[in-house]
Regions:
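Short active-site neighborhood of thiol/selenol oxidoreductases, capturing the structured segment around
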Residues: 50-71
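N-proximal helix/coil linker or "cap" segments that precede and/or mark the start of modular domains
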Residues: 21-34
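Short, internal strand/loop/helix patches
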Residues: 90, 107-140
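Structural microenvironment flanking redox-active thiols in thiol-disulfide oxidoreductases
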Residues: 66-113, 130
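Bacterial N-terminal signal peptides that target proteins for export
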Residues: 1-10
Length: 178
């Protein structure tokens, strides 16, 4: 379990380098416009999403029970990090859908990782992001999103990425770098 969580954390570290507003009952898709919302810092204090509206965001929203999804993609990102002053990347741990891992233990691990790597890692103990953005079912999912500065979802994937999705991810990254 710890190995899986650490692998997810590496994903978050690697990452650092329009539609209508979503109602809670809708499912977000590419083109959906989302609003600033809150998640929690590693000490469980509510915080707004960093740089929302100021930079394009690359968000890894991961269920730690299934953090090994997309391991080949994660390895590829480790080799070819996304580097741009226009894109801010961070991870969010979906605590609500990880009943086998006590939230306090996960937060402690996140705090250690943040201190060691200076990675931006947040937690979502109650589906705050999922509900605010209408992400639908995120249980057992590795969710990867690219959100433009104006709040438009430019890329959204849940679960294992296909080759076509990986190609699309990099295409959108290049678009957002400009």
């Amino acid at each position: 379990m710890r190995t899986i969580f650490i692998r997810w954390m590496l994903t978050a570290v690697v990452a650092i380098a329009g539609g209508s507003v979503v109602a809670q009952t809708q499912t977000a898709t590419v083109g959906t416009k989302v609003k600033q919302t809150k998640v929690c810092d590693p000490s469980n204090n509510p915080v707004e999403l960093p740089y929302f509206g100021k930079k394009n965001l690359m968000i890894f929203y991961v269920d730690p029970d299934h953090a090994s999804q997309n391991s080949a993609f994660v390895a590829e990102l480790e080799e070819n990090q996304v580097k741009s002053d226009k894109i801010y990347g961070f991870g969010i741990v979906n605590l609500k859908d990880a009943p086998l891992l006590p939230n306090s233990i996960v937060r402690m691990m996140v705090r250690r990782k943040v201190k060691k790597t200076r990675a931006a890692i947040y937690t979502d103990p109650d589906h705050m992001l999922r509900d605010a953005w209408g992400l639908g079912d995120v249980n057992d999912q590795f969710v990867l999103m690219l959100v433009a500065k104006d709040g438009t979802i430019e890329f959204l994937s849940k679960g294992e990425l296909s080759k076509a999705q990986i190609d699309e991810f990099y295409r959108v990254v290049e678009k957002l770098k400009k």
